[in-house]
Amino acid sequence: MDASGCMKSLLLAATQYRAAKTPSNAALVQRSLEVISGLKLTRLFASNQILPSECLNCLVELLEDANIDPPLTLSLVTLLSQLASDSETREALRDTYSLTNVLAGVVHRSSTNLSDPVLLQSIQLLQRLTYNVPVFCAGANIDELISFLMHHVQSTEDELTIPCLGLLANLCRHNLPIQTQIKSLNNVKSFYRTLISFLAHSSLTMVVFALSVLSSLTLNEEVGEKLFHARNIHQTFQLIFNIVVNGDGTLTRKYSVDLLMDLLKNPKVADYLTRYEHFTSCLGQVLDLLHGKDPDSSSKILELLLAFCSVVELRHTLRQAILEPSGLPVSGNTRFVTRSKTFEPSVALVHLSNQPLEGSEDCSVLALQLFKEVFEDVISSGNSASAEHFVDLLLPVLLDHLQTPEQIVDELLVKKKCERMVKTINVLTVLCRDDILKTHASKLLTASQCVSLIEHQFSYSGIDAGFGTKVVDSKMCKLAADIILKTLDLMSRLKQDVPGMEVSFYKILQDQRLITPLTFALTSDYREQVQVGLRILFEAAPLPDFPAILLGESIAANNAYRQQEKEHASKRIQLQSPLISNVTVSSSSCANGDESTASNVQELIQKLHSGLEVKEPITDMRISDIMDIYEQKLSSLASKETRLQDLLEAKALALAQADRLMAQYRCQRAQAESEARTLAAMLKDAERKNEELNVLLKAQQVESERAQTDIEQLFQHNRKLQTVAEEHEMLKKSSVDLLQRYETTERQHKDLRITCNSLNKEIEAMKKLNESLKQQNDRTAAQLVESEEHRKELQQQLHDRESKIASLQQKIKGLEEKLKAQQKEKNSMEETVDVLRKELSKTEQARKELSIKASSLEVQKSQLEVRLEEKEALVKLQKEELNKHSTMIAMIHSLSGGKLSAEAVNLSL
C-alpha cells in the first residue's frame, strides 16, 4: 500500500474508533499506526499537503481524547516522537496543532502511575518539542505540568528525574511568565536547595540541567548573585567547560553550550569570562571537539564559538587559537603527542564548511559565519599576514561553494545551497577589505565564475520572470536576489584586480533582469541589504543603458503590493469571526454568480449573432476584428468562471476547517470555564494563605539561614576539590617530563649503538679499499707509459691543425663584416619595437579609461592587435636571423681558439 492509502486508512480507522471505541476498532487504528511508523514518512508529513495535515490533526485529536486505550496512547506518542525528528514537522506539531498542550494533558492523566511508559515517552517528546522554543504558559495543562515537574524533581530520584529536569529547563529558558509563576510558589526556596544539591551529582546531565534552571530563575536575583559571584564564577566556568568537553552525550553538550551562551548575554559574566585564566586551555579543548563528532555536537560547538565572537576580547583569543594553534596547550586526551596538521582547528573548520548538503545539521553555514568573524578580527587588528596560510587553505573550498550545482530536485537542498552561497560571498567580501588577503582571492576568483553564478540565479530561481514579479512571494527569490547583489558587490571590489571583471561587472549592471533584485534590496527591512543595494545603484546609475525608469516602477509596484497585502491581512483578521457563519451564504452566492455568468455568456453570443445579421454589408476584415474582440471577452469570462469554481471549492474547504475550529473553540471555552472556576477557588485559597504567611515567614527565615550554611559548605567543598585538581595537574606535568626524559635517553642509547656498528663496518671496508688501491697503482703505472706515446702522436696532429686554422681566420673576417651590417639592422628594428611599445601602452591606457564603452571600441582594438602581431612577427623573424648569426660567430671564435678538434668542425655552416 502506498503512503496516501495508508493515511486514508488511518483516517477511516480513527473515524470508526471515535464513533465506537471497540477493541476491533482500536486494533485497526493500532495496525494503521504501525504501518505508517514502518514507512518512515517523516519528510511527507513536513509538506503542506492536505492529506498529511489531516493525518497529523487526527493523531493529535486521538491523543487529546482521555478515553482511548493506554496501548493506543503509547503507539500515538511513539509515532509522534518519530515524526518530531524532522524540524519542520516538529514546528508544525508545536505551533499549528498545539501538541505541547495536548502532551501536557497526557502527562497529567498518566502522572498517577509513574511506571507507565506513556509518561516517560510523553515527557521526552515534550522535551524535544520545547527545546530552544518559548512556550505559551496559558492553560490548566501547562500549570499542572509545571507543578508535576517541580514535585517530581524534589521527590526520590528515579528514571523520570533527568527528563523532568530537562523539560523544566526548557520551560524556564527565555520564558518570563513561567519564571514568574515558579518564583511565586511557596516552596521555591526548597526547590532552589534541591537544585543546588544536584550540582554535586555524579551525572553531568543532571548537573547541567540543574544549573540551567538556576541560571534562568536566579541570574538577576540575590541567589543568582551569590551563585555566580566573582568568587565562584571561575569554578562555574570550569564546571561548564568540563561538561562541554566530557559530557555524557550530545544532549548534555547541547544544554551546556546553551547555558554558557545564556551566561555570556550577561555583561558581568562575559567580563568574568574574559578574565578567566584557564579560558585559553578550555578553548583549545573545545576546538578539539570539532574532530570526529556527530553533526549535532559540531553545530552546537560552532554556535558556542560564534557566541564567543560577540565579546571582542574572546574573539581575539578565538582568532589566535584558530590561526596560531601552536600556542595552545594540548588537550588531556592527546597530551603525549604533538598536535598534527590534520588536527588543527583551521583544518577541522574547513572540513566542516565543506559538509554535504544532505546532512541533518548545516554545519557549513555556521562555519562560514565563524570564518567571517575571524577575518573581521584579523583585519581590525591589522594582523593579516598571520591569516595568509589559512586563506590559501580556505579559498578552494569557498570557490567550490560558488560552483553552480546540477539540477537539484529537493527544494530544501536548493535552499541550503543558496544559503551557503550567501555566507561564502560574505566571507570573500570581508577578505577584499584587506589588500594582502584581497590579492590571494583575486588570484583564484575569475570573472567567468561570478558571471555564471549570477546567470544561474537569473535562470533557475525565477527572478527573471519579468517586470512586476512579486519578490516577496518566494523565499528562494529572496535568496537569489541576495546572491546576485552580493556577487555584484564582490565584483565591484575586485574589478581592478581580476582580468575581465570590470567589463563583466558593467555589462551585468545594464541588464534589465537586475531590476527585481535591486527592488528587493532597496525595499528590504534589513539594513545590510539596503546598503548593498545602494552601493550597486550608485555604480549603475551613471551608465547609459541602466533602466532607471523600470526600477522606479518596480519599486512602486512592490510597495503597492505590500500595502495591499497589509490591507488584506487586516481585512482577514476583521472578517475571521463572521466568515465561519457566512460560509454557506458565500458558497450559494458563488453558485448564483456562476449561473449569472453563464447567462451573460449566452446573451453575448446572441448579441454577436444579431450584430452579424444586421451588419452583413460590412467587410470581412471588420467582422474578423469583431470576432477577435468577442473571443477575447469569452476567454476572459471562461477564466473568471474557472476562478469562481476554484473559489467555491476553497470556500467548501474553509467550511470544513471552520467546523473543526468551532469544535476546538468549544473545547477551549470549556477549558476556560474550568480555569475560571479553579481561579475562583485559588482566590479563596490565597485569602486563606495570606493569614498563614506571618507564621510561615519565621520558618522561611530559618530555611534561608540553613540554605546559606549549605551554600557555604558547598563552596568549601568546591575549593578543596579545586586544590586537589591543581595537585593532580602538577603530578601529571611531572610525570610527562619524566617520561619525555626517559624516551630521550632511550633514543640516545639506540643512536650510539647504531654508530658503533657503522664504524666497525667502515674499518673493514677501508682495509679492502687499501688492497684495491695498491692494485690500481700498478695498473696506472703501465697506463702512464702508454699515454706518453699517445701524447707524442697528438703533438704531431696539432701542428697539422694550426695550418687549417690560419685558412679559417680569413673566412672569419668576411663574416664579421656581415655581422656589423646585421647589427645595424638590429638597432633599427629595436627602435621600431620601442615605438610600437609606446603605441601599445597608449592603447592600453585608452582601453582602461573607456572600459564602459568597450563594445564600441572593439573594432579599433582588433585592428591595433593585427598591426601589433605583424610587427611582432617581423621582430621575431629578425631575432631568429640574429640568433643564427650569433651562433655562427660563436662557432668561428671557438674554432679560432682551438677548442674544437678538426673532425668536430661543421664546414657546412
UniProtKB/Swiss-Prot annotation:
Give me the Gene Ontology terms describing cellular component.
chromosome; cytoplasm
Q: Which GO terms describe its molecular function?
A: protein phosphatase inhibitor activity
Q: Which GO terms describe its biological process?
A: chromosome organization; DNA damage response
Q: State whether keyword Coiled coil applies.
A: yes
Query: Does the keyword section mention DNA damage?
Result: yes
- The record places the motif (Nuclear export signal) at 602-616
Localization of this protein:
Cytoplasm; Chromosome
User: Entry's Pfam families?
Assistant: CIP2A_N
In terms of Gene3D superfamilies, this protein maps to: 1.10.287.1490, Leucine-rich Repeat Variant (1.25.10.10)
- InterPro entries xref list: ARM-like (IPR011989), ARM-type_fold (IPR016024), CIP2A (IPR042510), CIP2A_N (IPR048701)
> What sections of the sequence does the record tag as coiled-coil?
630-888
Which UniProt keywords are present, listed alphabetically?
A: Chromosome, Coiled coil, Cytoplasm, DNA damage
Chain's role: Acts as an inhibitor of protein phosphatase PP2A. Together with TOPBP1, plays an essential role in the response to genome instability generated by the presence of acentric chromosome fragments derived from shattered chromosomes within micronuclei. The CIP2A-TOPBP1 complex tethers chromosome fragments during mitosis to ensure clustered segregation of the fragments to a single daughter cell nucleus, facilitating re-ligation with limited chromosome scattering and loss.
The family note in this entry says: Belongs to the CIP2A family.
Q: How does it assemble?
A: Homodimer. Interacts with TOPBP1; forming the CIP2A-TOPBP1 complex.
Q: What's this protein's name? A: Protein CIP2A homolog
What is the originating organism of this protein?
Gallus gallus
